[in-house]
């Protein structure tokens, strides 16, 4: 559909894309039968994450060379095959999701044991299935396969959102399911429409040719159905309210929702719709780029203003995510190569920084019980590494140079100018200022303010729910034995938190810095540039 040169690619029959999807499913089964052996259960979690990431990473060189690994499971209906295909766009999302599954899985072990969480086996099994769905979305070769994997994410993340089983958690879970399934119905309606008119749902760089011949109003309707269906999970306003409510979930789940799988899957679907279903040329011809950009811009501004009002740390991060995910939508809606590149680079840039923020908030809660912005005064002296990582991620979210957020936002600024969207240029600058306004007071209070009372949030001894006894053996930490629900208020071995909590957040903070300092040496830029070339025929040196 686009006049741009589409780079030649060749499908290579391979089991690897399907294996990357199936491995977490197998791990979920093994986790389920290992419930009485927590160390074995958690070993399966980490092993599955590492294997999935290794498989995904192994396909990157071939994807960049135009050799696309594909697994054709077979035809599910005339004209529709169940295909997993590792193209550059899918590789970008799969690399982020599978890589951060490793980090989230390790962190989750420390978190659920530290708090003595119940139903840990269910937690880790659902986490594994969620990542299977996320990589399935990434490698889906057509809209139908994407839809199936998209709904797998919905089903798998419901027990994670409602994990606490409180009235508030159940209500949040029901709301999430209602929104997600409603969006799924809208999405499926659009998929049926695409197949009816085009005779295929297979993705094609630059768009499906047959959709360029349909009646313009019918084309706009189909585009609206697809984008609206994906926008629910992407938390685009006014379809966002499920996300702040879902923050009742355990912090690793919040990180999964925001940085790894759920909202990223929604944003990914919007990108697929613009680039590989309709194509930028058709979207421009139908006059749909400007309205989509306007919705994204409004979401960025309103969500940033709402974030300023939140005292709950996770709620502030939730509204930040609502705003930040619309950067991706805005980038693709600008219909310029630079805008598309910026939107694509925001997948890893936002993921690294936002996951860091959530992991820091989780560590604060495990060790001190801190949940609110108004409670962080002086906590930087107790947990300096944690709050330093929080500061780095906050600066990245604001788009400060030499950090990951600047890399993506710079290209978004360039794309806005190229599109003549000076309003969006100004909006991006204002959004950066608002990010500073709602993140930096947390960092300042943590390091430079004194608490009102002598020791408002001392570090807990265990972490909560588990500790080592005199014999050096770790107590239950939530695996079936009774344990102190809070622990004693002194430092755990004199450290700010356990290695299982501190290590992952330092890794994601380091990735945020590395991506900002050396973007040309990080694979995400090369992969994103390959997507831009395949869709528009234009690349960046």
Annotate each language-model stretch with its function.
Residues 151:
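Short phosphate-coordinating micro-motif centered on Lys-Gly-acidic
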Residues 2-18, 26-125, 466, 472, ...:
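Transmembrane helix-loop-helix hairpins at membrane boundaries of multipass inner-membrane proteins
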Residues 201, 383-387, 441-541:
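Cytoplasmic/organellar membrane-interface segments at the starts of transmembrane helices
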Residues 61-69, 194-202, 519-524:
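Helix-to-loop transition at the C-terminal end of transmembrane segments
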Residues 103-116, 121, 127-146, 156-445:
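Hydrophobic transmembrane alpha-helices and their helix-loop junctions in integral membrane proteins
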